[in-house]
């Protein structure tokens, strides 16, 4: 039997704390230099980051992604590499920003790099991200990590581009990627690719989606269509709901399930059988007792990219319109990675993508031991990208090449970190090697292991 997600998290102990130093550290894969670590005393706190002004915008960007244009080479430097961290270190998101900074500091400590210096800058405030980028670049930053929010990325990007310095943002909004900007967050596209590919490998043919009527929902539908075009099958149904609909989705799910047409077809079948007097027809009519509809919905896999209370409000309503989740496979997103998902019977047997839970658990243990707190979900992005920077300082670039050139950042073998393997693609999006989890009551388990290299097939 495959181990459950919860058992992975419980297995981290004193022994794995030591293993963390070798396993969770990011290393360039397949032929590039690995990083070997030993446990050391936790470093002294670093000086407080320089602040800019208060109030970072958080609304997502809406512009289409631009193709990544290689920078002319970036700054050529010797000695210690300076890497900026653009984070909201004051204001409403200060706790998140501090957690991201903690994760980056932890990565620097574990890497034992003496060739890397972090330059934290506060993005809070009107124009804060642009001011933070300018401040860091004036201090000699050769690479920018962050910001978190898409609008802040848009503000910082032109400043960095003018200096030929690449940006690896912590956003998951692919619309800000391109022209020297990378998106290292967990994009819906990457998540949907993984779960659709897995569903296809298990026989799913016809896909449907039940999504919020929002830009996120639109992006999810586009990602589903693209994934199905890549891996095969067809998208047969799409239904949208507003954010206030989740407690009663009756009209939306009724239409999604073709419930009225299937009820009408059942009625016709019953009437036809009732008009006959032979024993076979009588037996067939009796078998229809308790049946609500004729046939199945026009899909065998249903994507529901929600989580938390919304997911738990939506799922029980499926059976009201005869969507039998024993015959229709439910598919989810990272938002399903919640212990309460396991308590909803309608989601039993559903699949969702996730980073490898064992390496994630090791990162969380390391963070907890160091900072006496649990890291937020996206803190591992700051951890992994800081380790990426540390790894690239371990080897010298080619003559005339920047340490953080586009070519070095986008090496096809990729990197491995707390969230498994990832690589920065030429379109500015991070591709990730994800696992697939199957939901079961108090015992969800991995059914599709995460790949360990990018030439390894997944199923």
Residue positions per predicted region:
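Extracytosolic ligand-binding ectodomains
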Residues: 2-459
